């Protein structure tokens, strides 16, 4: 994953994708940002890997929208932290540890509802932060 992220950064793919996301999302990007973090953590099972995969994308999108890159990077990491709890590998291990092997689907459903709610709240908070404290978040 690190090599893929480096390749994308060095070839300009990340900047190109960031410009596309900035054009598509516009001022609501802070609302979308934690969901990108969640996606990376869900795919990789790790906050760190999500940040490696999507951190630069988030920062470049923030720069394109003239939003503070540190603010957006923080929001990415929050989304990834919360999202990693619903990674299939973590649900599988947790079910096995507490003696609920075979019930992963039920656990996943319950965890998904909570995670999506928390990430949505994070996005709403991010929108409020960026909107109200626009000059502080740059």
Predicted regions and their residues:
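Small-residue-enriched core segments of transmembrane alpha-helices in multipass membrane transport
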Residues: 26-27, 57, 61, 112-118
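Membrane-interface interhelical connector segments
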Residues: 12-27, 56-57, 65
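Small-residue-rich segments of transmembrane alpha-helices in multi-pass membrane proteins
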Residues: 1-4, 60, 64, 117-120
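Transmembrane helix-loop junctions in multi-pass membrane proteins
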Residues: 5-18, 43-46, 125-137
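Hydrophobic alpha-helical transmembrane segments of multi-pass integral membrane proteins
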Residues: 1-8, 24-57
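Juxtamembrane and boundary regions of transmembrane helices in multi-pass small-molecule transporters
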Residues: 81-138
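Hydrophobic transmembrane alpha-helices that form the pore/transport pathway of multi-pass ion
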Residues: 43-75, 104
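Alpha-helical transmembrane segments of multi-pass membrane proteins
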Residues: 28-42, 65-89
């Amino acid at each position: 994953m690190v090599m893929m992220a480096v390749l994308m950064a060095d070839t300009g793919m990340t900047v190109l994708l960031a410009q596309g996301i900035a054009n598509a999302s516009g001022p609501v990007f802070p609302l979308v940002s934690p969901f990108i973090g969640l996606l990376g953590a869900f795919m990789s099972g790790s906050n760190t890997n999500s940040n490696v995969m999507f951190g630069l994308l988030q920062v470049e999108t923030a720069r394109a929208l003239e939003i503070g890159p540190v603010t957006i990077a923080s929001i990415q990491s929050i989304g990834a932290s919360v999202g990693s709890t619903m990674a299939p590998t973590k649900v599988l291990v947790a079910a096995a540890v507490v003696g609920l092997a075979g019930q992963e689907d039920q656990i996943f459903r319950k965890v998904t509802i909570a995670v999506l709610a928390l990430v949505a709240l994070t996005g709403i908070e991010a929108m409020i932060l960026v909107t109200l404290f626009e000059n502080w978040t740059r």
